[in-house]
């Protein structure tokens, strides 16, 4: 099997990929994400995941590079990572009592310029009605500051969620079923390594 490389600095993606039991290394990508802002959410996360994987793959040989990107969308508004505690509080107040959609694109590229595969997952998440005190307390934990949509469902942010429809791991940042399916296309048997 070619060496597997995760093109992400996300600790959540690292933890999720490790669950598959495959050895991998990490090499974060450096791309200009702003050039994809005009695309609709599903196309955007796929394009960004592919761009991240390609950027890392270009400098490698004999490696499979996995890229991913996640967006949160509510009522047509894309919510990225908040740039301050105040921005996080505004996002959480906006999401309160609403259902939003989490999109994660996943791409695999055979380095350096080989075959590519890309797909995405989509999950609906409904937030509880949050009080200003709950929002303030959650923001004070610091947890929302490095996450799209200003919450982490795998942490204390779970208390904000009334329910989800779809893949939980997609909301965390890496839809494992799609990852397994893409890796299988490239000859990686996740089940044979469990």
Curated annotation (Swiss-Prot):
Localisation: Cytoplasm
Reaction equations catalysed: dTTP + H2O = dTMP + diphosphate + H(+); UTP + H2O = UMP + diphosphate + H(+)
InterPro entries: ITPase-like_fam, Maf-like
Record's GO cellular component terms: cytoplasm
GO molecular function terms attached to this record: dTTP diphosphatase activity; UTP diphosphatase activity
Organism of derivation: Moorella thermoacetica (strain ATCC 39073 / JCM 9320)
E.C. numbers: 3.6.1.9
Site for Important for substrate specificity, residues: 12, 70, 154
Active site: 69 (proton acceptor)
Protein name from the UniProt record: dTTP/UTP pyrophosphatase
């Amino acid at each position: 099997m070619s060496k597997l490389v995760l093109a992400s600095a996300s600790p959540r993606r690292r933890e999720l990929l490790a669950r598959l039991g495959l050895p991998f290394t990490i090499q974060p990508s450096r791309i200009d994400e702003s050039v994809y802002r005009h695309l609709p959410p599903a196309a955007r996360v796929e394009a960004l995941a592919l761009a991240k994987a390609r950027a890392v793959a270009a400098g490698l040989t004999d490696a499979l590079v996995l890229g991913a990107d996640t967006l949160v969308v509510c009522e047509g508004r894309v919510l990225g990572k908040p740039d301050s505690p105040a921005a996080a509080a505004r996002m959480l107040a906006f999401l309160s009592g609403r259902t939003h959609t989490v999109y994660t694109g996943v791409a695999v590229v055979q380095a350096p310029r080989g075959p590519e595969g890309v797909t995405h997952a989509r999950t609906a998440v409904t937030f509880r009605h949050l009080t200003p005190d709950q929002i303030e307390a959650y923001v004070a934990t610091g947890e929302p500051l490095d996450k799209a949509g200003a919450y982490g469902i795998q942490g204390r942010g779970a208390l904000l969620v009334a329910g989800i429809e779809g893949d939980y791991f997609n909301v965390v940042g890496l839809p494992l079923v799609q990852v397994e399916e893409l890796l299988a296309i490239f000859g990686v048997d996740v089940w044979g390594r469990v």
